[in-house]
């Protein structure tokens, strides 16, 4: 499915780096096992999963592993793990984001650390990626809380464009464990081919995005991407195996793993 880079390590390895982020604090019980293989953690803020105690415990794990601490806000929808779209007013969207980040910031202040980034979760992430006005509200809300916070968003999406438009630092995200559609969006989870389960296939997809700035979609279309951070979902059934293999593969290619 992807170009093979096994024989071209020296050719492409100079000066490249990538962040590896993972969604955490969601009750999957694998956070401690994943931490050594990532550089950024997106921690659930209580609306789709988690609570103040899990936020604190996950922040502690991140600090122990020198991993960047990020807030992972979502729709208020624990029943569906934040994975169903909701139609809400823009003022409600601003409050939704503000309430979750403010809680997270209160905890980081208590623990003597700072929020490095925000990454939206699930349906909220996908909805904003496709909608300029929602993305603008999200970026403005984050900037009003702390202009030094970065926004992680889908590469090439409205989330990135609207953050850049107001001067909020954005980090373009790609995915190690998901397939793509020709429009640059992730394949919906209800489709059988949405998840990548083979660690080697996942690593090859990431290499294609980092080394070639492109990805082959499920229908064979090649699309351009800008890979600044790559996501591994903590609730993926093969998350630990994918993370370990990707970490080792990037090291073999001398691609530095570091937070933005």
Please place each PLM-identified region on the residue numbering:
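Active-site rim beta-loop-alpha module in soluble metabolic enzymes
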Residues: 156-162, 166-214
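Conserved, mostly hydrophobic/aromatic
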Residues: 23, 72, 118, 232
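C-terminal domain-boundary segment and adjacent tail
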Residues: 149, 241-260
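Flexible, glycine/charged-enriched surface loops at secondary-structure junctions
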Residues: 108-116, 213-224, 256-260
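Active-site-adjacent beta->alpha loops and helix N-cap segments on the catalytic face
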Residues: 31, 50-63, 129-136, 156-163
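Acidic (Asp/Glu)-rich catalytic clusters
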Residues: 32-38, 57-70, 108-112
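Glycine/small-residue-rich loop that forms an oxyanion/phosphate-binding "nest" at active or ligand-binding sites
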Residues: 78-117
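Glycine-rich tight-turn/loop motif centered on a GG-T
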Residues: 40-49, 80-94, 128-132, 145, ...
